[in-house]
């Protein structure tokens, strides 16, 4: 089957793409997200997606698509700031890269932050949770992207190293 992407333009360079090979909708062509881990507490921050986004009311990373000429690192840091108000330094460790048959890419990063904080959420989020590793594995419902990340051996190795 030929891969066909359909685009819906939302203005200001924002568009959604549709991959007919999988039936999936993606926001842009390249996107990324971060799974933040607090260095001191070893707990992990998850985003509960709002009812206004794809895969609503599922737990996932904070993230989104590249804007303009951004690189993936700058995009992930910007999205983390926009979605939860985090203005301090975050170290990003590359993890799993999801690639759809139609060409969409989602770059997952594990983030290291010094302290837990109370996120100031935007409209894309309905809530958040700070979790230990076992709670992360058992929380439901998970976004399909989070499920894939947690099945990836490299990503799990990075997480385990940081929480040990």
What does each model-identified segment do?
Residues 53-57:
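A conserved beta-turn-beta hairpin within the catalytic core of GNAT-like acetyltransferases
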Residues 43-44:
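Entry beta-strands of beta-propeller and related beta-repeat scaffolds
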Residues 3-7:
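Short linear clamp-binding motif
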Residues 8-33:
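Acidic, metal-coordinating catalytic segment for phosphate/diphosphate chemistry
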Residues 26, 51, 119-121:
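Short secondary-structure boundary/capping segments
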Residues 50-52, 78-79:
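Recognition helices and adjacent regulatory flanks at domain boundaries
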Residues 59, 64-154, 163:
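Unchanged
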């Amino acid at each position: 089957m030929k891969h066909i992407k359909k685009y819906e333009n939302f203005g200001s360079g924002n568009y959604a793409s549709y991959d007919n090979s999988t039936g999936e909708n993606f926001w842009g062509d390249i996107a990324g997200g971060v799974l933040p881990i607090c260095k001191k507490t070893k707990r992990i921050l998850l985003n509960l997606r709002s009812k206004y986004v794809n895969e609503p009311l599922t737990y996932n990373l904070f993230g989104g698509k590249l804007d303009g000429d951004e690189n993936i690192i700058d995009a992930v840091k910007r999205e983390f700031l926009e979605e939860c108000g985090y203005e301090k330094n975050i170290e990003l460790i590359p993890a799993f890269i999801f690639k759809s048959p139609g060409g969409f890419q989602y770059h997952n990063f594990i983030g290291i932050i010094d302290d837990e904080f109370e996120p100031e959420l935007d409209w894309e989020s309905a809530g958040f949770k700070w979790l230990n590793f076992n709670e992360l594995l058992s929380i439901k419902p998970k976004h399909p992207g989070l499920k894939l990340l947690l099945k990836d051996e490299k990503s799990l190795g990075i997480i385990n190293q940081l929480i040990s």
